[in-house]
From Swiss-Prot:
This is Kremen protein 1. Disulfide bonds join 32-114, 55-95, 84-109, 122-186, 147-167, 151-169, 190-198, 214-240. It comes from Mus musculus (Mouse). Residues 414-473 are annotated as: Essential for apoptotic activity. Residues 116-210 form the WSC domain. Glycans are attached at residues 59, 217, 255, 293, 333, 345. Residues 21-392 are extracellular. In the adult, widely expressed with high levels in heart, lung, kidney, skeletal muscle and testis. It comes from the Eukaryota. InterPro entries: CUB_dom, Kremen, Kremen_rcpt, Kringle, Kringle-like, Kringle_CS, Kringle_sf, Sperma_CUB_dom_sf. The gene is Kremen1.
Length: 473
C-alpha cells in the first residue's frame, strides 16, 4: 500500500495546509471540493478504473428518474454523455449501469481525483489497534463536521468516521499502515446528514481537522480555505479571519471553486494585509468572478454571517506566484574581437594611467574560435596539438618581450631624469640662463607598433615644472 504522501500527491497541490503542516507534492489540481462530489465535472465513465462497469448515457436513461429529458439545462452536470455525476446529492458520484440479475441499475463511482482537499481517504479498521488511538464518541446525529469539530476541540490532528455514527480522534501519522480501501467502501451515510459519507463497517474515512475551522494562518504556495463548519452549512453569527502570507510572492491567484452564500448580509472580503483596505467584497447579492489576481504577498480573508439564514458556504483555492529576477544571459557566438573590445571598454581608465594593457590577437590565418587561450577552443590531437602549442609559446614570448621592453624603457627614462640634478639655491641664477637646462626625453610606448624616442621641449621652460615627464601635454 502506498504511503499517504504519495496518495495525497495524486489529489492536488491545493491540499488543505497551514504553515505548520506542509502540503504534499503538487499536482494539476483536485476535481472535487465537496465531501460528496456534487461538484464533480470530470470525465470518468466507468464505475471503477479497474474492474468497473460502463456507465449509461444520461440522454438514454429515460426509464430512470435522472436524465436529460427531465433536466435539459445541464442541472447536476447531466448532458449527452455518460460521465459519473451526483445530481441528487448522494454521498458520492454515481451513474446508471445495465441491469443485471441482482436488479442493481446504478452504482457509485470510485474516482481517485474526486476527493476534497482535507479528505485523507478510506482505510481499514481491524480494531487492534484502530487507525486513530485518541478519544472517540458515538452519536445518532453525527456529521463530518461535528466529528471534526469535536476532535479539533480536543487538539487532535485527524478525525475519522465509521459506520455512520462513530467518531474517532488521533494524531497517528501511520494510519495508512492499516491498509487503504476503495472510497466506495466508506459510503455509509452519516446519521446526521444522509448526503455525507461516514465510513463503513470496518472502514474509517479520515479528515484533517483543519477543514471547516473558523480562521487560520496560511503560508503555503497553494491551499484551499473552506468556510467555517464545512462541509456542513455555516452557522449564524460567525466572524472569521484567515491570513494568507507568502513571503516573496509577486501575486496571489484566487479561485472560488464553490460559493453558496444566499443571505445578502453575509459576506466574504479580501483585505490588503498591510493596510487593511478592502480589495474584494462578495455577498449573497454579488457573485464572485471565476478567478482573479491580487498583486500582494499578504492578504486577509474575512467572513461574516448574521443571525439568520445559513448556506453551504465557500471553498476558495489560492495559488501564489513568485517571479524570478531576470538573469543576464551570456553572449552567444561572440567573436574574440568583441570580447577584446568589451574588456578594453571595462578597462578604459587604464588609458589615462601609466599602466599598459596588453592584448594578444590571433594570426590572420586562424579563425577567431581557434585563437590561443580562448576558452571555447578545444584541443585536438596530432599535428593540430603541435600547432596550438606553438601559438601558445608565441603568445607568451610576445607578452614577455613587450613587458621587458617597457620595463627597460622606464628604467632608462628614470636614469635620464635623475641625471639632471636639482641645482642649489645659489645656482638658480645660472639655471635660468638660456641653454643651461638639459633636454628632456619623452617616451611613448605603443604595444602594437614600435618604441619611438624623440626630443620634445616642455612648455614654459622658463618656469619650474614638477610634473612627471611621462605625462604628456
Amino acid at each position: 500500500m502506498a504511503p499517504p504522501a504519495a496518495r495525497l500527491a495524486l489529489l492536488s497541490a491545493a491540499a488543505l495546509t497551514l504553515a505548520a503542516r506542509p502540503a504534499p507534492g503538487p499536482r494539476s489540481g483536485p476535481e472535487c471540493f465537496t465531501a460528496n462530489g456534487a461538484d464533480y465535472r470530470g470525465t470518468q465513465s466507468w464505475t471503477a478504473l479497474q474492474g468497473g462497469k460502463p456507465c449509461l448515457f444520461w440522454n438514454e436513461t429515460f426509464q430512470h428518474p435522472y436524465n436529460t429529458l427531465k433536466y435539459p439545462n445541464g442541472e447536476g452536470g447531466l448532458g449527452e454523455h455518460n460521465y459519473c455525476r451526483n445530481p441528487d446529492g448522494d454521498v458520492s458520484p454515481w451513474c446508471y449501469v445495465a441491469e443485471h440479475e441482482d436488479g442493481v441499475y446504478w452504482k457509485y463511482c470510485e474516482i481517485p481525483a474526486c476527493q476534497m482537499p482535507g479528505n485523507l481517504g478510506c482505510y481499514k479498521d481491524h480494531g487492534n489497534p484502530p487507525p486513530l488511538t485518541g478519544t472517540s464518541k458515538t452519536s445518532n446525529k453525527l456529521t463530518i463536521q461535528t466529528c471534526i469539530s469535536f476532535c479539533r476541540s480536543q487538539r487532535f490532528k485527524f478525525a475519522g468516521m465509521e459506520s455512520g455514527y462513530a467518531c474517532f480522534c488521533g494524531n497517528n501519522p501511520d494510519y495508512w499502515k492499516h491498509g487503504e480501501a476503495a472510497s466506495t467502501e466508506c459510503n455509509s451515510v452519516c446519521f446526521g446528514d444522509h448526503t455525507q459519507p461516514c465510513g463503513g463497517d470496518g472502514r474509517i474515512i479520515l479528515f484533517d481537522t483543519l477543514v471547516g475551522a473558523c480562521g487560520g494562518n496560511y503560508s503555503a504556495m497553494a491551499a484551499v480555505v473552506y468556510s467555517p463548519d464545512f462541509p456542513d452549512t455555516y452557522a449564524t453569527g460567525r466572524v472569521c479571519y484567515w491570513t494568507i502570507r507568502v513571503p516573496g510572492a509577486s501575486r496571489i491567484h484566487f479561485n472560488f471553486t464553490l460559493f453558496d452564500i444566499r443571505d445578502s448580509a453575509d459576506m466574504v472580503e479580501l483585505l490588503d494585509g498591510y493596510t487593511h483596505r478592502v480589495l474584494v467584497r462578495l455577498s449573497g447579492r454579488s457573485r464572485p468572478p471565476l478567478s482573479f489576481n491580487v498583486s500582494l504577498d499578504f492578504v486577509i480573508l474575512y467572513f461574516f454571517s448574521d443571525r439568520i439564514n445559513q448556506a453551504q458556504g465557500f471553498a476558495v483555492l489560492y495559488q501564489a506566484t513568485k517571479e524570478e529576477p531576470p538573469q543576464e544571459r551570456p553572449a552567444v557566438n561572440q567573436t574574440l574581437a568583441e570580447v577584446i573590445t568589451e574588456q578594453a571598454n571595462l578597462s578604459v581608465s587604464a588609458a589615462h594611467s601609466s599602466k599598459v594593457l596588453y592584448v594578444i590577437t590571433p594570426s590572420p590565418s586562424h579563425p577567431p574560435q581557434t585563437a590561443p587561450g580562448s576558452h571555447s577552443w578545444a584541443p585536438s590531437v596530432g599535428a593540430n596539438s603541435h600547432r596550438v602549442e606553438g601559438w601558445t609559446v608565441y603568445g607568451l614570448a610576445t607578452l614577455l618581450i613587450l613587458t621587458v621592453t617597457a620595463v627597460v624603457a622606464k628604467i632608462l627614462l628614470h636614469v635620464t631624469f635623475k641625471s639632471h640634478r636639482v641645482p642649489a639655491s645659489g645656482d638658480l641664477r645660472d639655471c635660468r640662463q638660456p641653454g643651461a637646462s638639459g633636454d628632456i626625453w619623452t617616451i611613448f610606448y605603443e604595444p602594437s607598433t614600435t618604441i619611438s624616442i624623440f626630443k620634445k621641449k616642455l612648455k614654459g621652460q622658463s618656469q619650474q615644472d614638477d610634473r612627471n615627464p611621462l605625462v604628456s601635454d
